[in-house]
Regions:
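Glycine/proline-rich, positively charged
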Residues: 45, 90-187, 198
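N-terminal binding-site loop/beta-alpha segment at the start of enzyme catalytic domains
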Residues: 1-78, 351
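Acidic-and-aromatic substrate-binding clefts and catalytic sites of carbohydrate-active enzymes
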Residues: 27-31, 54-63, 87-90, 125-129, ...
Length: 351
């Protein structure tokens, strides 16, 4: 089966499934580094050629760089999306040398001459000054040839507008988006459509909650087995609670049985079918589910399927506000589980 592709810009095409890298950074069980690199080759050979990582995903940029080096025949067809997320404690006092140091470090780690896409985030756009000026330095590095394209992640629509109005050329936005978390729909997607900014969505499988394994199960409570489940359990609570989520899983299971696919693929197909969505990011610690995930390209949700899902989704409370507003509140229950200072440069790098 062929993997759907998406034209982000006239000169840049990606796979509509993106291999996520957060799960390789720790907090999701043991990672066999050698096997993880071999698995990357499996993804690329099967058509998932686009990888997502970040400057602060511990060890992941290096893994991708080692994969590129050890698989020279595959490296030319791979697209790598990394991030620039300055530490919270640095905000308001960031120098050009610090920004360029992080970008140069990503180039070294990934073993490339230029970064395909740098997705930018600033932890406190409203409380700590400088997020537009910092993005303009990324634009300077783009002009200098170190960055091919600039994207953003986890800004709300007002903040994204400030970046665009400030002269930052934004190609993509990475929001959290799923049937349970539809915050991008009210403002972010309409604005992005008007500016030709493409959505590359994460959280599409709720960290593993969108599987048949959870159907009919009692509500789980802390401590959960990994950070993803902790994060997305809060989203389920905001959606309307475990009971309503079970209704959604039941509807998805029925649809999946009809098309001979899993609950996860129903959720994934729903996201891929939304306006302005270029791709969905699926985190993986191994390649064991890759063949199953590719089945998302073998079916379509018909009118009856959409009505069945809408019947449940119409009952939801949904998380409040615009994209990432809840998570940005350090005193709130979403913000309290975030890690804000994971991007310290190596001691030999620039300050």
């Amino acid at each position: 089966m062929s993997v759907e592709r998406f034209q982000v810009t006239p000169d840049y095409e990606i796979s509509r499934l993106i291999k996520g890298g957060w799960h390789l950074a720790g907090g999701h069980g043991d990672v066999d580094r050698g096997q993880a690199i071999k698995d990357m080759a499996v993804f690329v050979e099967k058509g998932i050629t686009t990888f997502d990582c970040a400057d602060h995903y511990t060890g992941v940029e290096e893994m991708i760089g080692d994969f590129r080096e050890s698989h020279p025949s595959l490296a030319p067809v791979v697209q790598v999306h990394t991030k620039f997320v300055p530490d919270y404690e640095k905000l308001g006092n960031i120098k050009r040398e610090y920004i360029e140091g992080i970008i140069d470090r990503s180039i070294r780690r990934l073993k490339v001459e230029r970064l395909d896409l740098v997705q930018y985030y600033w932890w406190d756009p409203d409380g700590k000054p400088g997020f537009v000026d910092t993005a303009l330095i990324l634009r300077d590095l783009q002009v200098a040839g170190k960055i091919a394209r600039i994207g953003v992640t986890n800004f709300n629509t007002r903040q994204l507008r400030m970046l665009v109005d400030g002269g930052v050329p934004i190609a993509t936005n990475q929001p959290q988006y799923s049937p349970v978390d539809r915050r991008p729909e009210s403002k972010m997607i309409p604005y992005s459509q008007s500016k030709n900014i493409v959505q590359l969505c994460y959280g599409t499988l709720l960290g593993g909650f969108f599987t048949g394994d959870w159907l009919g199960k009692p509500e789980p409570f802390e401590p959960l087995v990994n950070r993803s489940l902790t994060k997305y359990k809060l989203i389920i609570e905001d959606f309307g609670g475990w009971g309503l989520f079970q209704q959604l899983l039941q509807a998805m299971k029925k649809i999946g049985d009809k098309h001979d696919v899993t609950v996860a693929l129903v959720a994934l197909r729903w996201v891929l079918d939304q306006p302005n969505v270029g791709a969905a990011i699926v985190g993986a610690t191994s390649a064991r589910h890759v063949d199953e995930n590719l089945k998302v390209f073998t079916f379509a949700l018909d009118a009856d399927d959409k009505r069945a899902l809408d019947a449940v989704l119409s009952q939801c409370q949904s998380p409040e506000g615009d994209c990432y507003d809840l998570e940005r509140d350090k005193k709130g229950r979403h913000g309290q589980i975030m890690r804000y200072n994971q991007n310290a440069l190596e001691t030999h790098a620039l300050p």
